[in-house]
């Protein structure tokens, strides 16, 4: 019998082993859909981004008007821009849910997969940040100024580092051109790290909601999960297109309709919604270096999660106390997101400080403590 080209061709067999004949657990729920949704988000962002880059000019005197030109004069330019801007929001919604799934079901015990995932998150955050600067509106400019300025808190080399990043003594034309270069490059870096992420995942196979070995009960990825992924994709695209077509500026900042002006500071400088939780943690510490360290820790703490797992059970499916703690953490992150969008005044300052303290306490102290307690409860 002639060999099946799907299984023998050097390139096709890689695709086959990853997307067609991949043995998958029979019981993974819709929470396992977000990986494929993230891949589609990345593809969408790269395609819309390439189309936008064809009409964009990375120069301080032309950037703002080139974006306006794209929206007004390019065929479907308004649509491409709205898809790209809101695609970023959906990218972050998917990645937050994907990380939440990993936390809840103990997927972080696949350490290499988890760590490459954290690197992907950091790269995505960097990409979104430099991309937000490109339209060169007021919030683009001042957001870039505030966040890049944080590096000046690094002792001894800080100020030099910031001026090196800026390419001058303030955010100006050299900053914009290098941010465009980085924003063009990083999505392809993300695509590369995604391949590594999947390579590590396929070493072990997927986890499942029970957190037990599923080797005795595997099903082929296609048609079961390929179809399930298409359903998930459809369900994501409905709200995505609704947002991009009916309310494209809902999540944006009105300040960005004003061209960047170094002489006028906006009353409230704040990032896009997906960075607000980290921004709230940054602002909750009155010291500059302390705030920067807390900001870094708010994301890098994910790298510690595998070492803080003390439970004998992998997932939280049968651990009600840990479940309560998990949803407290989710509520806490929503509070931080809200605080990040508020002005720095009473009572928001103290709420932000309490929420920041709770965030680190839950992850570093309460999760391991409750895990240990649940182990003891199992013995009685």
From Swiss-Prot:
Its main location: mitochondrion. GO terms for biological process: mitochondrial electron transport, ubiquinol to cytochrome c. Its cofactor is heme b. Keywords: Electron transport, Heme, Iron, Membrane, Metal-binding, Mitochondrion, Mitochondrion inner membrane, Respiratory chain, Transmembrane, Transmembrane helix, Transport, Ubiquinone. One of its GO terms (molecular function) is metal ion binding. SUPFAM superfamilies: a domain/subunit of cytochrome bc1 complex (Ubiquinol-cytochrome c reductase) (SSF81648), Transmembrane di-heme cytochromes (SSF81342). InterPro entries: Cyt_b/b6_C, Cyt_b/b6_C_sf, Cyt_b/b6_N, Cytb/b6-like_sf, Cytochrome_b, Cytochrome_b_C_euk/bac, Cytochrome_b_N_euk/bac, Di-haem_cyt_TM. It comes from the Eukaryota. PROSITE patterns: CYTB_CTER, CYTB_NTER. The cytochrome bc1 complex contains 11 subunits: 3 respiratory subunits (MT-CYB, CYC1 and UQCRFS1), 2 core proteins (UQCRC1 and UQCRC2) and 6 low-molecular weight proteins (UQCRH/QCR6, UQCRB/QCR7, UQCRQ/QCR8, UQCR10/QCR9, UQCR11/QCR10 and a cleavage product of UQCRFS1). This cytochrome bc1 complex then forms a dimer. Heme 1 (or BL or b562) is low-potential and absorbs at about 562 nm, and heme 2 (or BH or b566) is high-potential and absorbs at about 566 nm. Component of the ubiquinol-cytochrome c reductase complex (complex III or cytochrome b-c1 complex) that is part of the mitochondrial respiratory chain. The b-c1 complex mediates electron transfer from ubiquinol to cytochrome c. Contributes to the generation of a proton gradient across the mitochondrial membrane that is then used for ATP synthesis. Belongs to the cytochrome b family. This is Cytochrome b.
């Amino acid at each position: 019998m002639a060999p099946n080209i799907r299984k023998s061709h050097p390139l096709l067999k890689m695709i086959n082993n990853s997307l067609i004949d991949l043995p998958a657990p029979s019981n993974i729920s819709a929470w396992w859909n977000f990986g494929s949704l993230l891949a589609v988000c990345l593809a969408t962002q790269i395609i819309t981004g390439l189309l936008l880059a064809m009409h964009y000019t990375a120069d301080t005197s032309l950037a703002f008007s080139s974006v306006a030109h794209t929206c007004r004069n390019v065929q479907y330019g308004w649509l491409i821009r709205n898809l790209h801007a809101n695609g970023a929001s959906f990218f972050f919604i998917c990645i937050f849910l994907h990380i939440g799934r990993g936390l809840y079901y103990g997927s972080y015990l696949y350490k290499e997969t988890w760590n490459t995932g954290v690197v992907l998150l950091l790269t995505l955050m960097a990409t979104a940040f430099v991309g937000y600067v490109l339209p060169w509106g007021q919030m683009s400019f001042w957001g870039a100024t505030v966040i890049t300025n944080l590096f000046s808190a690094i002792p001894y080399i800080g100020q030099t580092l910031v001026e090196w990043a800026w390419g001058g003594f303030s955010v100006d034309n050299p900053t914009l051109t290098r941010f465009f270069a980085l924003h063009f490059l990083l999505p392809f870096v993300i695509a590369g790290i995604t391949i590594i992420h999947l390579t590590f995942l396929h070493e072990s196979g997927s986890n499942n909601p029970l957190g037990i070995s599923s080797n005795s009960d595997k099903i082929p990825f296609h048609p079961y999960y390929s179809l399930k992924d298409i359903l998930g994709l459809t369900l994501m695209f409905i709200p995505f297109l609704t947002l991009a077509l009916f309310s494209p500026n809902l999540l944006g900042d009105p300040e960005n309709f004003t061209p960047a002006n170094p002489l006028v500071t906006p009353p409230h400088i704040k990032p896009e919604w997906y960075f607000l939780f980290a921004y709230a943690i940054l602002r909750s510490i009155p010291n500059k270096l302390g705030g920067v360290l807390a900001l870094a820790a708010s994301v890098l703490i994910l790298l510690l999660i595998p070492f803080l797992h003390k439970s004998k059970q992998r997932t939280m499916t049968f651990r009600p106390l840990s479940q309560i703690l998990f949803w407290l953490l989710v509520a806490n992150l929503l509070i931080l997101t809200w605080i990040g969008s508020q002005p720095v005044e009473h009572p928001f300052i103290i709420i932000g400080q309490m929420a920041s303290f709770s965030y680190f306490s839950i992850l570093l102290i309460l999760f391991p403590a409750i895990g240990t307690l649940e182990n003891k409860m199992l013995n009685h």
